[in-house]
Amino acid sequence: GNVAMHLAALRALEANGGTKVNLKYLIEGSEERGGEGLSQLIKDRPELFAADAILIADAGNSAVGQPTLTTSLRGGAQIGVQVDTLAAGVHSGQFGGAAPDAAKALMRAIDSLSDEYGRTVIDGVDTTAEWSGQEYSAEAFRADAQLLEGTKIMGEDDPAGATPVANMVWSRPAITVTGFTSTPVAEAVNAVPATASAQLNLRVPAGADAAAIADAVCAHLRSHTPWGAHVKAEVLESNAGFATDPEKPAAALLGECLSEAYNAETAAQGMGGSIPLTTELQEAHPNAEIALYGVEEPKCTIHSANESVDPTEIENIAAAEALFLQRYS
């Protein structure tokens, strides 16, 4: 979608007299497959990426038809944890009830990373920050995240008041269990599990120290694993978040062009994903302005088997990009 958008913008630009901007386009896809070729190229040949303004089309509007600049990206980390309780699995009929179950121990440790309303808590880490940008309504989140009927948004049941969604997805740490292994269901036997392991995905708000918070998660897991179970928790990798100022000249101009293309005021939002390229480019070129936008509004369901794009988003974002390239010079 974003590639088609760039092509449409270039065609519109050519049809309307071109631009005086010295223009570079980079299209790269290996990062989505875990490749590091672009990261290495930025380190080896930073001069190739020198620019006054860097526009990264790897984001999207908050909704179809609502022009949006992304001003904040979460950083994150991958954390591995393993719990061992027995030298080997033992018969649940003979030992169950007294023998410590490694799977249960790991479940309890992971569960301790949430309060009673499902909000993330980490020993020694502030998890109460407030988001000051555009709101993210509970209704929109339910639709975007495709919650099943009757399921609750985390923090929704707090008697003191529901926690705003934007706080939890853009301003506070979040932990997701992305993998869990003990005995596969297909191989279930009547035995007390001796070992269990999990992989956790940590997301942290822009400006937070992802590595330090990941270390705090590991310490929390060690502290909260019950029954004297042996626990190993380690940070597998981490990456920093990113924030940009929408009031700087290039971002402000892009916002104006988006507003003109959509005939609506441009909003600012955070984004839960991480784009390591942003921090790598900013480190290589500290004075460059970086703006994040694109065609990936929530209904695109990016990274899913049925991802899609709304053609009107391609049309309008392309028009905004063409306007920007005409005026930025």
Give the role of each language-model region.
Residues 242-260:
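Short, low-order "capping/linker" segments at domain edges
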Residues 98-99, 187-194:
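Short, solvent-exposed beta-strand/turn "edge" segments of beta-rich domains on protein surfaces
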Residues 3-72:
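Acidic/histidine-rich catalytic neighborhood of metal-dependent amide-processing enzymes
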Residues 82, 106, 180, 192-196, ...:
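Zn-dependent metallopeptidase/amidohydrolase metal-coordination segment
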